[in-house]
């Protein structure tokens, strides 16, 4: 009830502000339309001046894009619906303790300026030239960040991407084309007749051993092909050119894709003789070697009972316990708000660069193996993390699967977001007065 009274009081003050504005206008004998309430949304209101301001900005943007303007009534209806939904979500954020700190907002403003190739001062000047104050732009960005967090917290948990969906996506024609590799191969053949004598076998094996020995010494494969190979490509250094997977001779089909550039196969024997195949180069495909970190963390989030200050205080207390020698895994099980990792003692297993939100990713990179980070804040709340180990790994296949999962998640998220917005709109008390 206290929250309701405070919010209702805020709504009254908002309306009083509009009334004072009207009195000022009348004092200057200006004929203007009375600012009024155009929507009641639970215990908040939307004013006509807010509607006009948002509609004006949208019209300016449409003009810049040379897009025909819709009828005024249609535009106002759409904008009012947008403001109603924003009001509902901001009220949800207030109840859920979702905030954006000044430090996070400042960093976001810096990032926006950087993305536009400007310093922060230049960005402020550009806004001023467009008739927008930096403070109003800053608060609008804060509002958008808060709404985004409300949506993520509410909608993400409703989105599920199954392994079958990922696998089906990876089997699609577009995904296969993206994954296709090409191999630049070279080949040596030590030929044997159909029914070789013991002497012929012995001579062939002698050549094989010479080739193996010289390869171990670093002799160039092409030079060895010219010297020893009985294949028609010998004079070209055994070069088979670039081959797609389905163009690789069946004898090498299982071996060649597993070779790294510069690597030569073990001898391959068949009825025509003994073969060596070398991977000169690879191109295409999704091979990517990265440094992975084995990480565990503890997350403390804001909620109805814990505001940002309390969340920060709790993570600092947990950090103190870790520094005092208490077991990280047990503390994660007892305190972490990340239910999945908490059950595993905070373990996130092996994490690739870029898998996590930027704040987490940066702290993970900066924390030495075995060390525990100081408390830091991300969009999800307050964390501490420990880097348990690091390794290099080729994540090509996993990267493709991860990208497929992200594509599918985005598609489902957009669909589920619209469903969720409809639900919260239906569940809210909304009275339109336009």
Curated annotation (Swiss-Prot):
The keyword Chaperone applies. Residues 180-281, 290-389 form the PpiC domain. GO terms for biological process: Gram-negative-bacterium-type cell outer membrane assembly; protein folding; protein stabilization. It is found in: Periplasm. InterPro entries: OMP_Chaperone_SurA, PPIase_dom_sf, PPIase_PpiC, PPIase_SurA, SurA_N, Trigger_fact/SurA_dom_sf. Keywords: Chaperone, Isomerase, Periplasm, Repeat, Rotamase, Signal. Residues 1-29 form the signal peptide. It comes from the Bacteria. PROSITE patterns: PPIC_PPIASE_2. The keyword Signal applies. The PPIase activity resides only in the second parvulin domain. The N-terminal region and the C-terminal tail are necessary and sufficient for the chaperone activity of SurA. The PPIase activity is dispensable for SurA to function as a chaperone. The N-terminal region and the C-terminal tail are also required for porin recognition. This is Chaperone SurA.
């Amino acid at each position: 009830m206290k929250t309701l009274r405070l919010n209702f009081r805020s709504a009254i003050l908002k309306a009083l502000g509009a009334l004072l504005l009207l009195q000022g206008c009348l004092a200057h004998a200006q004929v203007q339309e009375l600012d009024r309430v155009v929507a009641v949304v639970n215990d908040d209101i939307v004013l006509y001046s807010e509607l006009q301001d948002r509609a004006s900005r949208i019209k300016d943007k449409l003009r810049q894009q040379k897009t025909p303007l819709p009828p005024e009534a249609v535009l106002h209806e759409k904008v009012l619906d947008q403001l109603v939904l924003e009001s509902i979500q901001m009220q949800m954020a207030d109840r859920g303790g979702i905030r954006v700190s000044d430090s996070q907002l400042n960093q976001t403003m810096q990032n926006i300026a950087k993305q536009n190739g400007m310093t922060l001062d230049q960005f402020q000047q550009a806004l001023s030239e467009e008739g927008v104050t930096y403070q109003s732009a800053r608060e609008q960005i804060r509002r958008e960040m808060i709404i985004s967090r409300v949506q993520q917290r509410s909608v993400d948990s409703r989105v599920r991407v199954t392994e079958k969906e990922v696998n089906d996506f990876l089997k699609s024609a577009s995904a296969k084309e993206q994954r296709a590799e090409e191999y630049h191969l070279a080949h040596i053949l030590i030929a044997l007749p159909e029914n070789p004598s013991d002497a012929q076998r012995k001579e062939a094996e002698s050549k094989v051993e010479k080739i193996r020995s010289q390869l171990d010494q670093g002799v160039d494969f092409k030079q060895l092909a010219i010297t020893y190979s009985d294949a028609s490509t010998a004079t070209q250094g055994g070069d088979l050119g670039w081959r797609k997977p389905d163009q690789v001779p069946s004898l090498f089909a299982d071996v060649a894709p597993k070779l790294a550039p510069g690597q030569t196969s073990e001898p391959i024997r068949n009825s025509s003789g003994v073969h060596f195949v070398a991977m000169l180069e690879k191109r295409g495909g999704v091979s990517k070697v990265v440094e992975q970190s084995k990480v565990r963390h503890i997350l403390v989030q804001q909620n109805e009972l814990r505001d940002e200050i309390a969340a920060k205080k709790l993570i600092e207390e947990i950090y103190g316990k870790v520094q005092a020698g208490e077991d990280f895994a047990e503390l994660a099980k007892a305190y972490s708000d990340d239910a999945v990792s908490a059950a595993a003692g905070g373990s996130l297993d092996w994490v690739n660069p870029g898998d996590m939100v930027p704040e987490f990713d940066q702290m993970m990179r900066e924390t030495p193996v075995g060390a525990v980070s100081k408390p830091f804040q991300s969009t999800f709340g307050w964390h501490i993390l420990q880097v348990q180990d690091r390794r290099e790994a080729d994540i090509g296949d996993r990267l493709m699967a991860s990208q497929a999962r992200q594509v599918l998640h985005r598609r489902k998220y957009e669909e589920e977001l619209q469903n969720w917005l409809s639900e919260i709109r239906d569940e809210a008390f909304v009275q339109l007065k336009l």
